[in-house]
Amino acid sequence: MNPRLRVYIFAGIFLFIALIILIKIFFEEEKFDVLVVSLDSKEKTSKECLSNLQSVSIPVPALIIDKTVLKAIYQENCEHIFERKIKIGIDKRNWKLIANHNESSIFECIRMENKTSNDYLQFDTQPARAVLKNFNTFSIGNLHIPSNIPLFLKMWERSEIRGCLNLIVHRNMTKSQQFNHGKEAAEKLAEFRDVLLTFNMFAFLNGGTLLGWYRECGFIPHTADIDLAMFAEDFHPEITHFLLSRTSSFQLLRSLGMLNDSYELTVTPKTGYIVNMDLFLMYKDVHKNGSVINWVGGASNDIKYKYTYPAYDPWCAADLHGHLFWVTCSPQKMLVFEYGNLWYEDHPSSQYDWRSTAKNVRTNGLWSDVELKNVSKLY
């Protein structure tokens, strides 16, 4: 056989084998990949809604924020949208341009602030409100309508702003420990917030992260992780498959508990600033007298723990280093319940035992030997 031909044959065989191996690796790695799609999006509405909205004009861009009108557009039934004024958000930089607009009887114009340093829009309503601004819209003239109306309405329900206290915290025992990357941590937390939103999951600040935001408008310097919670009924288990995929920008480190009992996930960013984030599921118990408590769980070996709260109300919004996060509407009440009346004083993390220090923690039974095999998973 011609030596040159022999070289070509062997090279061809080698390339073929390499191609087969690459294809095999590709499909094995891709088997967990999930296509994340924002649900309920639309870029159009009915002819009736289109005709009605085209019949009015506004000289500057405006965002429809009226809940009734948005629901009508989504349901494609706009017969009654002009029975009262339509609430719209106007960028405050354009406010003077609408001062004498002759359609003022149709619209209730609300100032809207769009700071480039923030990832949210703020509205001068009473009380003030804020929603994330990374949503798509479609336009009818100068009227802009959220493409994903159900998601926007969920954000609006959680948009009432709560402020933090920015207290000066004396740290004689922990002053040498500094969390110097608060902005980077908030940015990664915002990225994880957005991942959860693609699954229609709304998480809220909890535990020490809630305390740090409310007390000092940041993260507690000597904490090592970030705490989030969300209602168990809103959790979508598919997210665990996504977090195990190459597509995810976060790595799933572990899961604890079961979906109906003391479940939590720990994730960390794959790139950039690295900080662990714990996502706890929050459950609801209804007592015989009708009173409601909420709780999140924890576990140490086979012992289960339960952190209880009064009926939880995570329907408000907060700023943390220019990023929007959701929080309880009564932060001080919840912090007193968890940390006691001296919640505003620093407590070194080295002296904090999560199994006993909190005021709202108690044991909650044991995992059985069978359960123990499944309740703790490392990835």
Curated annotation (Swiss-Prot):
Subcellular location as annotated: Membrane
Signal peptide coordinates: none
One GO cellular component, as annotated: membrane
Keyword tRNA-binding: no
Membrane topology, record value: Single-pass membrane protein
Any single GO BP term: protein glycosylation
Transmembrane segment boundaries: 7-27
Top-level taxon of the source organism: Eukaryota
Alphabetically ordered keywords of this record: Membrane, Transmembrane, Transmembrane helix
The protein's name in its UniProt record: Uncharacterized protein T07A5.1
Source species of the chain: Caenorhabditis elegans
Organism lineage: Eukaryota, Metazoa, Ecdysozoa, Nematoda, Chromadorea
